[in-house]
């Protein structure tokens, strides 16, 4: 058994990493990054723009969600998938940043769905994760841009990413 549950680790990491309050501008920048890439589905940038327009409502709405365990499993999936691949290029930090960014965007897609429909079914959740995966993970250009942005963009700093998790 692990000495810490994921929630304990999250709380401790936030305490250590987030020296400043959550900045919605950083979240806006993250969404803008994915919105600005060449979409496979024309509705994708429209969905992300809608989320950016509603951040003031969606961020608190997302925090009220009781889906923490599902997002915990999702981040473990991304970590498992990308940390195994990082051995080829030893860029572990970017892979961790992608996992946090992916779950952040997916959780906002879920919050937007919940707000628009009054609920969130398993099918909705799967579709939101599939849409993100299709637009981000399966676009080599988007992934290459993300890996490069990890080193240069403030919205992908550890303090910004820790703020996304709070």
Model-flagged regions — what are they?
Residues 1-166:
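Hydrophobic, aromatic-lined core segments that form the binding pocket/scaffold
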């Amino acid at each position: 058994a692990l000495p810490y549950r994921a929630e304990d680790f999250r709380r401790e990491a936030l305490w250590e990493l987030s020296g400043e309050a959550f900045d919605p501008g950083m979240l806006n920048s993250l969404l803008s990054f994915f919105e600005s890439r060449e979409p496979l589905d024309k509705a994708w940038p429209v969905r992300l723009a809608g989320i950016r327009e509603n951040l003031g409502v969606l961020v608190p709405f997302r925090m009220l969600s009781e889906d923490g365990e599902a997002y915990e499993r999702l981040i473990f999936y991304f970590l498992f998938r990308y940390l195994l691949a990082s051995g080829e290029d030893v860029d572990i930090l970017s892979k961790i940043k992608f996992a946090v960014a992916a779950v952040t965007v997916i959780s906002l897609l879920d919050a937007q769905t919940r707000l628009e429909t009054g609920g969130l079914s398993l099918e909705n959740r799967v579709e939101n994760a599939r849409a993100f995966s299709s637009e981000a993970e399966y676009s080599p250009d988007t992934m290459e841009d993300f890996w490069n942005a990890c080193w240069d963009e403030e919205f992908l700093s550890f303090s910004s990413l820790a703020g996304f998790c709070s």
